[in-house]
């Protein structure tokens, strides 16, 4: 078994694609439209291939906002320079909700941001991912 993708419903597909490409450095891998059921899918990721996990952005035509509820937590992305990545989010008008720094009680460097639709994304500095969270 493997993780194939995580689906996020978005209110403005172009804005979301731009964020995931320009700010997070992902590539647009493919898109698919379904006129009968009125939705468009965009798949983004860092690698293309059967073993690579992807983000699926789903735009339901005419729906511009969703309630997230309390069940969704976040996705996590390893980054080489967490401070520069947070600055790129800020420069794009994004929201940094937890500044980069060590996790409480440990040395793993993390930050939290929100994408244009308010989904939470955790950044973990790559040199920290080897030791695991909380170390």
From Swiss-Prot:
Keywords noted in UniProt: Lyase, Metal-binding, Nickel
GO BP terms: methylglyoxal catabolic process to D-lactate via S-lactoyl-glutathione
Entry-linked Gene3D superfamilies: 2,3-Dihydroxybiphenyl 1,2-Dioxygenase, domain 1 (3.10.180.10)
Annotated ranges, domain VOC: 2-126
Cofactor(s) it depends on: Ni(2+)
Family: Belongs to the glyoxalase I family.
Active site per database record: 122 (proton donor/acceptor)
Stated role: Catalyzes the conversion of hemimercaptal, formed from methylglyoxal and glutathione, to S-lactoylglutathione.
Keyword Phosphoprotein attributed: no
Gene Ontology cellular component annotations, sorted alphabetically: cytoplasm
Organism for this UniProt entry: Haemophilus influenzae (strain ATCC 51907 / DSM 11121 / KW20 / Rd)
InterPro entries in the record: Glyas_Bleomycin-R_OHBP_Dase, Glyas_Fos-R_dOase_dom, Glyoxalase_1, Glyoxalase_1_CS, VOC
Cofactor descriptive note: Binds 1 nickel ion per subunit. In the homodimer, two nickel ions are bound between subunits.
Positions annotated to bind Ni(2+): 5, 56, 74, 122
Subunit and partners: Homodimer.
Pathway note: Secondary metabolite metabolism; methylglyoxal degradation; (R)-lactate from methylglyoxal: step 1/2
E.C. code: 4.4.1.5
Sequence positions that bind substrate: 9, 60, 74
Protein name in the entry: Lactoylglutathione lyase
Reactions catalysed: (R)-S-lactoylglutathione = methylglyoxal + glutathione
Chain's gene name: gloA
GO molecular function, one term: lactoylglutathione lyase activity
């Amino acid at each position: 078994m493997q993780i194939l993708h995580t689906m996020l419903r978005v209110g403005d597909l172009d804005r979301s694609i731009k964020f995931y490409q320009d700010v997070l450095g992902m590539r647009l891998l493919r898109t698919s439209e379904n006129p009968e059921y009125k939705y468009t899918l965009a798949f983004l990721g860092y690698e293309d291939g059967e073993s690579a996990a992807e983000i699926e952005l789903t735009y339901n035509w005419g729906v511009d906002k969703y309630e997230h509820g309390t069940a969704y937590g976040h996705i996590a992305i390893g980054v080489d320079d967490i401070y520069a990545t947070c600055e790129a989010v800020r420069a794009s008008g994004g929201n940094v909700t937890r500044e980069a720094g060590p996790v409480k009680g440990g040395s793993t460097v993390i930050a939290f941001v929100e994408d244009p639709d308010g989904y939470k994304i955790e950044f973990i500095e790559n040199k920290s991912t080897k030791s695991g969270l909380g170390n």
